Swiss-Prot record:
It comes from Escherichia coli (strain K12). GO terms for molecular function: proton-transporting ATP synthase activity, rotational mechanism; proton-transporting ATPase activity, rotational mechanism. This is ATP synthase subunit delta. The gene is atpH. It is found in: Cell inner membrane. Keywords: ATP synthesis, Cell inner membrane, Cell membrane, CF(1), Hydrogen ion transport, Ion transport, Membrane, Transport.
Length: 177
């Protein structure tokens, strides 16, 4: 867990509440995603860790973001710069996405398989997870050859390991005990 998670929550909550009030949740998520990527830039990271005045830092950051930030997004950047919190932007984005998922009653589900799954297989997994979690799900599919066959499904703290690799590991544990 990131060191900035506690710092990020109030900024994410304020941004999310504002976005909901102004019916611009998608726009805000896009702005935060862009700003979070800017913080990961090597040159910007040097500026963020430097001794620039908050006003100068905020204006430099806003200049780099250009038209990706609207006036309200720029205001958030200024407030975060004043408080020395621009490094927390990736965590603000993460918290914002979490608040959005809770608000929309959706859950992110990672599906890891050895090969690409068919639309029919994805539909079955989606339906089963929606029933199990009692909410809509968004599937994030990844291919990992080490799975060998089967799938690994992750939703929050829940992990369903139906992979051959997982079965072999469990069998090895039983044989060694």
């Amino acid at each position: 867990m990131s060191e900035f998670i506690t710092v990020a929550r109030p900024y994410a909550k304020a941004a999310f509440d504002f976005a909901v009030e102004h019916q611009s949740v998608e726009r805000w998520q896009d702005m935060l995603a862009f700003a979070a990527e800017v913080t990961k830039n090597e040159q910007m990271a040097e500026l963020l860790s430097g001794a620039l005045a908050p006003e100068t830092l905020a204006e430099s950051f806003i200049a780099v973001c250009g038209e990706q930030l609207d006036e309200n997004g720029q205001n958030l950047i200024r407030v975060m710069a004043e408080n020395g919190r621009l490094n927390a932007l990736p965590d603000v984005l993460e918290q914002f996405i979490h608040l959005r998922a809770v608000s929309e009653a959706t859950a992110e589900v990672d599906v890891i398989s050895a090969a690409a799954l068919s639309e029919q297989q994805l539909a079955k997994i989606s339906a089963a997870m929606e029933k199990r979690l009692s909410r809509k799900v968004k599937l994030n599919c990844k291919i990992d050859k080490s799975v060998m066959a089967g799938v690994i499904i992750r939703a929050g703290d829940m992990v369903i390991d139906g992979s051959v690799r997982g079965r072999l590991e469990r069998l090895a544990d039983v044989l060694q005990s």
